[in-house]
């Protein structure tokens, strides 16, 4: 049996980030994943400015290195299309120059981005990376936890377990008591298409809020090589209540909706349409306990409005590494001491998650969404205000005040 002070279960962006920050502190760990990289992960594939900032925190040179990868596209903004068909184009940076400026966001398939992080992991002697090992049992022991693989031949004992093993983490459910709640869980479908027409020249991602699909949304994200990530998302609660067949609805919109019919006329579906679940951060949860912390999707930290989870996984991975260092320094792995991790994560993310929840709920009022999109599409100053929302939390805070919308509607 191997013994390690710190074991990280799951080598996606959250787990890899935790391992890399530990390595920077000179702290060894073992990082285990059931897959062998590169491996696919069903996702929207968009990397926000927050992801770029977290890469900088790992190593200031990483964003430039990512920018050199042929498997990514720089993205300069988002097109929001309202239920009434108003297009609100929100650049990540006002008055950007795509030829000169450093991109604020990227689009990269998870098979490529996750492997990009794993390549950084492999360069760090402090990290023992174990791929292709499916952990079947996680049991409490006197020191912390013992993990056993499916064959029963591989075992590791650890004083501190960082569970970063995704939306379907058995450990998060059994040990931390995190249940899948339809009101705080999103069902998503993702497909790859080739030759979708009308993609933005600066690779803006598209979020369509279609009248006959609310409160769900339809997305199109451009990818290298003429590909696009195309998908839909809707709260599981709504899917259940309205008995929505997401795949049927997605194909119906692609084949017959006036917004998409011509754009997909010459497009080809590449591979299968795949489903996935998004545990949303619209509710505060206890994400640590005796000898463990939960990171990323295992901690239910996905943004309820945008559906983005990579940046929050990386942020929680960074704070898990900080807490792990304190645990080793103090030789304290108790639940009480571990609460410092919960506090740090929610200090950073809760305002943002709470606000995104409110914005998600605005989709129940399409008339208001239409008014905002219509006004902003004709008002450069207002469009820039909304643009800053993606980087300036104080500004996002203003957007939840009813007076902001009243001024918007009547000025």
What are these regions (language model features)?
Residues 1-12:
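Beta1/beta-strand and adjacent pyrophosphate-binding region of the FAD-binding site
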Residues 56-113:
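A conserved beta-strand/loop capping segment in the N-terminal third of enzymes
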Residues 7, 23-43:
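Glycine-rich FAD pyrophosphate-binding loop
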Residues 155, 238-323, 327-329:
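FAD/FMN-dependent oxidoreductases across multiple families
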Residues 120-260:
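Predominantly flavin-linked oxidoreductase catalytic cores and closely associated redox partners
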Residues 325-411:
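C-terminal helical "tail/cap" subdomain of flavin- and related membrane-associated enzymes
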Residues 15-16:
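N-terminal Rossmann-fold NAD(P) dinucleotide-binding loop
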């Amino acid at each position: 049996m191997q013994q390690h002070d710190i074991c990280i279960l799951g080598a996606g962006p959250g787990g890899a980030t935790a391992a890399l920050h530990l390595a920077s502190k000179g702290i060894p760990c073992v990082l285990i994943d059931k897959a062998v990289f590169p491996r696919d992960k069903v996702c929207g594939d968009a990397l926000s400015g927050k992801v770029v900032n977290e890469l900088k925190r790992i190593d200031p040179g990483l964003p430039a290195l990512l920018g050199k990868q042929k498997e990514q596209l720089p993205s300069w903004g988002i097109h929001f299309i309202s239920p009434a068909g108003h297009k609100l184009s929100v650049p990540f940076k006002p008055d950007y120059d795509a030829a000169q400026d450093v991109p604020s966001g990227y689009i990269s398939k998870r098979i490529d981005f996750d492997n990009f992080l794993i390549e950084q992991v492999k360069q760090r002697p402090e990290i023992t990376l174990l791929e292709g090992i499916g952990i079947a049992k996680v049991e409490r022991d006197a020191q912390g936890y013992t993990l056993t693989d499916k064959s029963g031949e591989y075992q590791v004992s650890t004083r501190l377990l960082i569970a970063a093993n995704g939306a379907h983490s058995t450990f998060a459910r059994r040990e931390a008591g995190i249940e899948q709640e339809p009101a705080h869980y999103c069902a998503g479908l993702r497909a790859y298409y080739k030759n979708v027409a009308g993609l933005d020249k600066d690779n803006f991602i598209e979020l369509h809020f279609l009248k006959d699909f609310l409160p769900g949304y339809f997305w199109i994200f451009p990818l290298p090589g003429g590909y696009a990530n195309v998908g839909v998302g809707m709260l599981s609660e709504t899917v259940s209540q309205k008995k929505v067949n997401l795949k049927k609805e997605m194909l119906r919109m692609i084949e017959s909706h006036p917004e998409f019919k011509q754009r997909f006329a010459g497009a080809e579906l590449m591979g299968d349409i795949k489903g996935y679940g998004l545990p949303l951060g619209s509710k505060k949860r206890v994400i640590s306990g005796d000898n463990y912390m939960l990171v990323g999707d295992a901690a239910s930290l996905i943004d309820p409005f945008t559906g983005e989870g990579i940046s929050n996984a990386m942020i929680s991975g960074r704070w898990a590494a900080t807490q792990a260092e304190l645990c080793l320094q103090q030789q304290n792995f108790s639940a009480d001491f571990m609460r410092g991790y919960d506090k740090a994560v929610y200090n950073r993310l809760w305002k943002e998650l709470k606000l995104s929840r409110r914005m998600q709920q605005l989709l129940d009022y399409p008339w208001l969404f239409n008014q905002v999109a219509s006004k902003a599409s004709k008002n450069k100053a207002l469009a820039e205000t909304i643009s800053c929302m993606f980087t300036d939390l104080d500004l996002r805070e203003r957007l939840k005040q009813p007076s902001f919308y009243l001024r918007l509607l009547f000025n």
